[in-house]
Amino acid sequence: MSARAGRLGIGIIGAGHVGPILGAALAGAGHAIIGISAVSDESRDRAEAILPSAPILDIPVIVERSELVILAVPDAELPALVEGLAATSSWRAGQLVLHTAAGFGTAVLAPAQALGAIPLAIHPAMDFTGTSIDIGRLGETWFAVTAPVPVQPIGQALVVEMGGEPVIVAENDRAAYAEAIEIATAFSRSIVAQATGILSEIGVEHPGGFLSSLVRSSVDNALRETSRPESIEPLDGEDF
């Protein structure tokens, strides 16, 4: 089975920073957005701005109508959501169920899988703003894909259709993966906040803009260094 075999009817549960963006990317690849759930006024506004043609529907209706259900909810809410929908026999055989939580693999989708649903855990390694700018950033983003081996090509195809690069992460490695994501995100925010605070105290206007080029180039250089083969030693007099 391949996500490229035809257009999927996609339902999105959660209109936070991630769900509408992934929905927009998949809609751009030719899939149909059946509906999206949104509770707060802020999430409704976000859904309407990013997916203006997608109706805002109740969760059971979305699950009933969708071939692919994207669960873009906070990690803490995911287990209860999956179990609750299983308790009402909402999941269907052959239906794709995809969650975006970094800290979970597909085990959390076991209640849906028991009813015949096909589980996928796909996490984009990106700090989302929840605005349309994120759609363009997907093209430079790696996605962690966790799924049973026969299902991995589906997850990889969906990532490619969203413009990203897929990398397989084993079920047992999801906790370590989530830790790495949290460290990178929290550290970056903490350091930037500390540095901009110091600049503000000494009277530098717009400290975020002042540090933008420095922070981006420093991070790029650090990432480039981690990708450098250890076997390559710089020649005397050369500065890589």
Locations of the language-model features?
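NAD(P)-dependent Rossmann-like dehydrogenase/reductase catalytic/cofactor-binding core
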Residues: 2-4, 208-240
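NAD(P)+-binding Rossmann beta1-loop-alpha1 motif at the extreme N-terminus of oxidoreductases
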Residues: 1-64
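Short, hydrophobic beta-strand segments that form beta-sheet elements in well-ordered domains
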Residues: 34-38, 97-100, 145
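Phosphate-coordination loops involved in phosphoryl transfer and adenosine-cofactor binding
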Residues: 6-9, 94, 140
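Rossmann-like NAD(P)(H) cofactor-binding subdomain of soluble oxidoreductases
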Residues: 45, 55-133
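Short phosphate-binding/catalytic loops that engage adenosine nucleotides
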Residues: 31-32, 117, 164, 204
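Internal alpha-helical scaffold of NAD(P)-dependent oxidoreductase catalytic cores
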Residues: 46-50, 112, 133-224
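Hydrophobic Val/Ile/Leu positions in short beta-strands of Rossmann-like dinucleotide-binding domains
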Residues: 11-12, 71, 145
